[in-house]
């Protein structure tokens, strides 16, 4: 609860600045890259979120990280501020909130699409088009692969789930046969 409200405050402040400067999309992308980089490196995550390391040590790492990702000054300043306040552990929630605000601002929604095998470009585009019709918004797909689905696709947009997986169809058939 507290983490969410703190993350929301930071995200809203940065988002307001991004809107003012017309940099919503680039900052959203660079923040997502930053989040993925931090989450993809357990050692980096440990150093950034562990107060055992001095502020100077964390600041030096944050400076290198910002330079490596070529972050613009404002997103980089967010990193420095989080480091100075021992709140780098909030980064993931801040980025997620920023991206949600950016998507809303730009009139788009994100859909998590899970398939049994990787989707090719045309299949992914067809799914995005169908979901766009259903939601009346531009849909961005976050794709995942789960072989346990056996076949088909499960798409989640917000709280709505469209389940066209073979696994679910087989489970439904099994339930009907038991009756």
Curated annotation (Swiss-Prot):
It comes from the Bacteria. It is found in: Cell inner membrane. Pfam families: OSCP (PF00213). GO terms for molecular function: proton-transporting ATP synthase activity, rotational mechanism. InterPro entries: ATP_synth_OSCP/delta_N_sf, ATPase_OSCP/dsu. It is a peripheral membrane protein. Keywords: ATP synthesis, Cell inner membrane, Cell membrane, CF(1), Hydrogen ion transport, Ion transport, Membrane, Transport. GO terms for cellular component: plasma membrane; proton-transporting ATP synthase complex. The keyword Iron does not apply. Belongs to the ATPase delta chain family. F-type ATPases have 2 components, F(1) - the catalytic core - and F(0) - the membrane proton channel. F(1) has five subunits: alpha(3), beta(3), gamma(1), delta(1), epsilon(1). F(0) has three main subunits: a(1), b(2) and c(10-14). The alpha and beta chains form an alternating ring which encloses part of the gamma chain. F(1) is attached to F(0) by a central stalk formed by the gamma and epsilon chains, while a peripheral stalk is formed by the delta and b chains. PANTHER family: ATP SYNTHASE DELTA CHAIN. F(1)F(0) ATP synthase produces ATP from ADP in the presence of a proton or sodium gradient. F-type ATPases consist of two structural domains, F(1) containing the extramembraneous catalytic core and F(0) containing the membrane proton channel, linked together by a central stalk and a peripheral stalk. During catalysis, ATP synthesis in the catalytic domain of F(1) is coupled via a rotary mechanism of the central stalk subunits to proton translocation. This protein is part of the stalk that links CF(0) to CF(1). It either transmits conformational changes from CF(0) to CF(1) or is implicated in proton conduction. This is ATP synthase subunit delta.
């Amino acid at each position: 609860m507290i983490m969410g409200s703190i993350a929301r405050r930071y995200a809203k402040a940065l988002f307001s600045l991004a809107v003012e400067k017309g940099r919503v999309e680039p900052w959203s992308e660079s923040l997502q890259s930053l989040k993925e980089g931090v989450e993809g490196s357990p050692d980096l995550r440990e150093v950034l979120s562990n107060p055992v390391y001095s502020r100077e040590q964390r600041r030096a790492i944050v400076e290198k990280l910002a330079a490596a990702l070529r972050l613009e000054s404002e997103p980089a300043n967010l990193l420095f501020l989080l480091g100075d306040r021992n709140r780098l552990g909030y980064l993931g929630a801040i980025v997620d909130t920023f991206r949600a605000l950016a998507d809303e601002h730009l009139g788009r929604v994100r859909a998590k699409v899970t398939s049994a095998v990787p989707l090719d470009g045309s299949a992914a585009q067809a799914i995005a088009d169908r979901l766009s019709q259903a939601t009346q918004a531009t849909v961005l797909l976050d794709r995942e692969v789960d072989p346990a689905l056996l076949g088909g696709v499960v798409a989640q947009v917000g709280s709505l789930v469209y389940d066209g997986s073979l696994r679910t169809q087989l489970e439904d058939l099994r339930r009907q046969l038991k009756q």
